[in-house]
């Protein structure tokens, strides 16, 4: 799969599994302006490393927001509640996401 070979526009996000190994899952997610439903928060058991490879997005945490543009990345520790407050539509937001249990680094929210 080429990261930039995008599926036709869909009413919901398109997620594709790129790699899965014990303790690690890597996905490509394409968003055409979708955001988390009002009142919904991700509260994951795994750490999530996100890299925005196209477009822009706004991630909301309980006490702050993070604006991501093309090339930005960060590590979201497990159990840190977050939601997608906004994602670009044209161009669509293309995410590369790795899920697992990682050591914290400077990129941690």
Region spans (language model):
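A short, N-terminal "cap"/entry segment at the start of jelly-roll beta-barrel domains
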Residues: 1-41
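Ligand-binding loop in jelly-roll beta-barrel domains
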Residues: 79-106
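A structure-centric signal for secondary-structure junctions around beta-strands
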Residues: 23, 46, 92-93
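Beta-strand residues in well-ordered beta-sheet regions across diverse protein folds
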Residues: 27, 52-53, 60, 85
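Short acidic-glycine-tyrosine-enriched beta hairpin
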Residues: 63-78
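Short, conserved beta-strand element in jelly-roll/cupin
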Residues: 43-59
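Structural motif
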Residues: 56-58, 65, 81
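Short histidine-centered beta-strand/loop micro-motifs
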Residues: 16-18, 38-44, 61, 66, ...
């Amino acid at each position: 799969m080429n990261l930039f070979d995008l599926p036709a526009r869909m009413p919901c996000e398109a997620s594709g599994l790129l790699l899965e190994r014990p303790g690690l899952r890597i996905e490509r997610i394409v968003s055409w302006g979708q955001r988390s439903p009002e009142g919904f928060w991700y509260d994951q058991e795994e750490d999530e490393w996100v890299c925005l490879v196209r477009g822009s997005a706004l991630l909301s945490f309980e006490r702050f927001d993070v604006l991501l543009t093309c090339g930005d990345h960060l590590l979201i520790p497990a159990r840190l509640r977050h939601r997608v407050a906004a994602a670009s539509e044209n161009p669509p937001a293309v995410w590369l996401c790795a899920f697992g249990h990682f050591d914290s680094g400077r990129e941690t929210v």
